[in-house]
Amino acid sequence: MDIIRKRAYARAGLLGNPSDGYNGKTISISIRNFRAEVVLYEWDSVDIVQSGDDRADFRSIHDLVQDVRLHGYYGGIRLVKATIKRFVDYCRERNLKLHDRNFSVRYETNIPRQVGMAGSSSIIVATLRCLMKFYGVEIPLAQQPSVALSVETEELGISAGLQDRVIQCYEGMVYMDFDRLVERVADGVTFYAYERLDPALLPPIYVAYHYELSEPTETFHNDIRGRYDCGESLVINAMQHFGRLTVQGREALLSRDWERLSALIDENFDTRRSIYKLPSWQINMVETARRCGASAKFAGSGGAIIGVYRDEAMFRVICDRMAAIGAHTIKPVVN
């Protein structure tokens, strides 16, 4: 029996997020410390195996309430099902004939949940990779993020942008330009300009995430989308500014101007704070890191932060201070 195993890694937005859903620009990194893995093999029926994240057994009603508060109502089964449906639709729309063999598929993930590290899209991307391998269908790399995004936006009605899917498909570090001027359409799929950057250009960076408090990403994004669509100038100007920060960040990386990059990271968060109403515990994470002398911004939708630190002594201080407020700190593995 041939067993197909595919992984997709957590990600952190270095600069520009959350402008990816608003024709902005971002730089993101993949974090190989955390991953989702999907295993698929031939079976006599289509069998989606429940994961430990799809909890249905609780110690008490209070345990159930706590699980919902931290992780929301949904596990990964709906993501796998929606990915399969979207893949089949993609192939049908292009007259790509699929063989009639069935499969069993299961997933597991160690990506911290609901802290903005793209745990949901990692399951989708890993599932999509398994399906392409099983059916011998090769979706062009530049189009894969858009197909993965459509699983959430079209199948599940979740507000999301391309950033997470781009970095999980490309891996490493990627500069992304979502301006309409660079928009391209191939085989009915819309995509944008994605440029790989050498991870060796990165300064010493940390990622810290809270392991007790969280907020589902789909909840986080909804209000800003409505304000943007209504033409609120504060939100529109902020999204444009995120793009400018990203262009400057790319230049800072290429010239190894780490002090400039660090300042841009701080400015990214300050701009975000000007348009979002943020929970105090998320602000506290950023301010705690800054008091250590590091830069800090959200790595995603909130619950995890990323920034530049100076040396090992500073990193140890960050770890200690973050632990004191219930957060864990890592050095992300990026390659």
Q: Where do the PLM segments sit?
A:
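C-terminal nucleotide
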Residues: 1-15, 19, 28, 32, ...
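Helix-loop-helix module between adjacent transmembrane segments
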Residues: 83, 113-115
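Short glycine/threonine-rich catalytic loop with a Thr-x-Gly-x-Asp
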Residues: 117-119, 295-301
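DPxDG-like acidic metal-binding loop motif
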Residues: 117-137
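Short, charged, amphipathic alpha-helices and their helix-cap/turn boundaries
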Residues: 104-105, 142-145
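Glycine-rich nucleotide-binding loop
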Residues: 100-102, 302
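Conserved, well-ordered active-site substructure
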Residues: 24-26
